[in-house]
Design a protein with these regions (language model features):
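Conserved hydrophobic/aromatic beta-strand scaffold that supports enzyme active sites
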Residues: 18, 104-108, 172-174, 194
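Short, charged/polar surface micro-motifs in flexible loops or helix N-caps
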Residues: 67-71, 78, 111-113, 155, ...
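N-terminal amphipathic, basic helical "cap/leader" segment at the start of enzyme domains
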Residues: 1-100, 197
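Small-aliphatic-rich amphipathic alpha-helix that forms the alpha element of a beta-alpha
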Residues: 47, 105, 111-160
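A glycine-rich helix N-cap at a beta->alpha junction
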Residues: 161-186
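Short Asp/Glu-rich motifs
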Residues: 73, 156-157, 163-164
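Phosphate/diphosphate-binding glycine-rich loops and adjacent basic-rich segments that engage nucleotide
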Residues: 184-197
């Protein structure tokens, strides 16, 4: 163990096992309870400890919980109802989309253009936020899923949840507990995707 790791009071094997054991749980199969206010704050606090070239904080958060999930569902239902050939079943499905988990966090990417920091790096920082929040939720004993779906790209939905035209949804993080045991999916072999230069 290095001198630096000793100052953090971390067990290297336990920390690495935490990273290696993380897996997503289907948003359709999450149940309560979700994180409380303090846990939610800590998940977000962990999320923002990511690489951020230029200290721009090119992200912000929208928390959907309680009745806020139902309000979001109404927005989705209204927006999808305006689409061609939308069935009543589909409208109801969208109305319940954000009810699938106790808490959903929208991670908003808000890049600044025409500055020396590349837009791509700012967007990658938002992706790192999403991933770090998944690890934080996992460390607290929750299951989380990072997804986008159509509602991350629909202009009317984005406007109605307060996004500016220059902002994007990097992901919706669904957090809860698994309603059934999780099964890990196959992962690529490290050697098959690694080259040495």
């Amino acid at each position: 163990m290095s001198d630096y790791s000793a100052t953090l009071n971390l067990s290297a094997p336990e920390t690495l096992n935490l990273l290696l054991s993380r897996r997503s749980g289907s948003a359709k199969r999450l149940t309560g309870p979700g994180p409380n206010a303090d846990q939610l704050r800590r998940i977000i606090a962990a999320g923002i400890r990511v690489p951020d070239h230029g200290k721009l904080a090119p992200w912000r958060f929208i928390v959907f919980e309680g009745e806020g999930r139902a309000r979001m569902g109404n927005i989705l239902a209204e927006c999808i109802a305006g689409e061609r050939d939308t069935s009543p079943e589909r409208i109801e499905q969208e109305r319940n989309r954000f009810m699938r988990a106790p808490v959903v966090i929208g991670v908003v990417s808000r890049v600044r253009e025409q500055i020396p920091i590349p837009v791509w790096e700012q967007e990658l920082s938002s992706g790192a936020v999403c991933m770090t929040m998944l690890f934080a939720a996992h460390a607290m004993g929750f299951v989380a899923n990072w997804i986008t779906e159509w509602c991350a790209y629909h202009p009317q939905v984005l406007a109605r949840v307060g996004l500016k035209p220059t902002e994007k949804i990097a992901g919706y993080i669904y957090i809860g507990h698994p309603a059934e045991p999780l099964e890990d999916r196959p992962r690529p072999a490290v050697d098959a995707i690694t080259t040495r230069f």
